UniProtKB/Swiss-Prot annotation:
MF (Gene Ontology): apyrase activity; ATP binding; calcium ion binding; calcium-dependent ATPase activity; GDP phosphatase activity; nucleoside diphosphate phosphatase activity; toxin activity; UDP phosphatase activity
Protein's UniProt name: Apyrase
Species of provenance: Cimex lectularius (Bed bug)
Subcellular location: Secreted
Activity versus pH, per record: Optimum pH is 8.5.
Gene assigned in the entry: APY
Record's GO cellular component terms: extracellular space
Main localization category: secreted
Length: 364
């Protein structure tokens, strides 16, 4: 199913008030006139493949990268100072990789955090940003409340694409959780779990769809239900058990998908138990999902921490991963940064960043 939500399509995203509707109309008009942000005129498909956007510095077998993380602060994203405004925290830092030993260190630019703002919301919530990814020369981030895909530039966000839930024929925005580039297209996924009632009854399979976006902003909705079932079956999990995804990447080097589940359980989903069902495993799958293999990650962790995002370290031939692990328990949020290789060997123990819930990381 193919649909383009970039330029002037019928509005499928229903705000909860007139102001929101007017704002969305304005943004769609803006996107129609100014799609230049991704560097394409209509019909162009030439790619900008520079990654990372900031050139790494290598000296004495040590490589330094600029790295960034962005937050999903849920209900706390609403601005306390400006009306009809929602805010996310964007934090950058320097990551150093010592090639000879694979030692990873990171230094955050604490005190220089940027507050990224938007007026767009759904149901009174917005700017709950769940991913950070470079695509076609731009840094993108994804609001899991509105379904908006933003371009992040100069510490400001500009809407690019609106993703509708499930098969694309829904008035609700898609709950984006992860995104990765494959074969020149951007794949955007959700939790990969059936949407159920509190009693465990399945209401829909919308989170088991994936969006494929080309460089012109055209969206194709893909039914990944079978793929997600195969991923969780690698851990002997079947419904009503579940596996919740927020972190996935495609590797051209291995021609495989890699998933770091946020949480998993043999039992039915329970919102309270979810807080302590954090996973600590890498799952790799071939392109057709015919074979999925789990690898346990070594090192110390806690059950309340689960992966919210990860990226391969550039120039490491996709052998080294840096990831975010978040905590959401009893109104407490925290984010930890870690690094490890594909065999599960920890190269940087889980180290706390701060009390924001960062759900997107990339080399910027």
């Amino acid at each position: 199913m193919r649909s383009s939500y970039r330029v002037g399509n019928p509005i499928r995203f229903q705000p909860t008030n007139v102001v929101g509707l007017l704002l969305l109309s304005l943004v769609l008009s803006f996107m129609l006139v100014q799609s230049y942000e991704l560097g394409h005129a209509s019909g162009e498909t030439n790619a900008n493949s520079k990654y990372p956007l900031t050139t790494p510095v290598e000296e004495n077998l040590k490589v330094r990268f600029k790295i960034g993380v962005i937050s999903d602060d849920d209900k706390n994203a609403v601005s306390k100072d400006e009306s009809n405004t929602w805010v996310s925290t964007y934090l950058t830092g320097t990551l150093e990789w010592e090639k000879s030993t694979d030692k990873i260190t990171v230094q955050w630019d604490k005190g220089n955090e940027k507050k990224v703002k938007s007026k767009y919301s759904y149901g009174g919530r917005g700017m709950e940003l769940s991913e950070l990814v470079t695509f076609n020369g731009n840094l993108l981030t994804f609001d899991d409340r509105t379904g908006l895909v933003y371009i992040l530039k100069d510490d400001k966000v500009y809407p690019w694409v609106v993703l509708a839930d499930g098969d694309g024929k829904n008035s609700k925005g898609f709950k984006s959780e992860w995104a990765t580039e494959k074969a020149g297209n951007l794949y955007v996924g959700s939790s990969g779990k059936e949407w159920t009632t509190k009693e465990g009854t399945i209401e829909n399979y919308n989170p088991m769809w994936v969006k494929m976006i080309n460089k012109n902003g055209e969206v194709t909705s893909l039914n990944w239900q079978t793929n997600y079932e195969k991923i969780r079956s690698s851990m002997n999990i079947t419904f009503p058990g579940y596996m919740w995804h927020e972190a996935a990447c495609w590797s051209d080097k291995y021609n495989k998908w890699f998933f770091l589940p946020r949480a998993l359980s043999q039992e039915a989903y329970d919102s309270k138990k979810f807080e302590t069902q954090g996973a600590n495993v890498i799952i790799s799958c071939d392109d057709k999902f015919e074979k999925c293999e789990p690898t346990q990650i070594q090192g110390k962790t806690e059950d309340k921490r689960g992966f919210s995002n990860f990226k391969f370290v550039p120039t490491s031939e996709d052998k080294i991963i840096v990831g975010l692990k978040t905590v959401e328990a009893d109104d407490t949020t925290e984010t930890y940064f870690t690094a490890f290789d594909l065999e599960g060997k920890v190269l940087l123990e889980e180290t706390k960043i701060d009390d924001h819930k960062y759900e997107g990381v990339d080399f910027v």
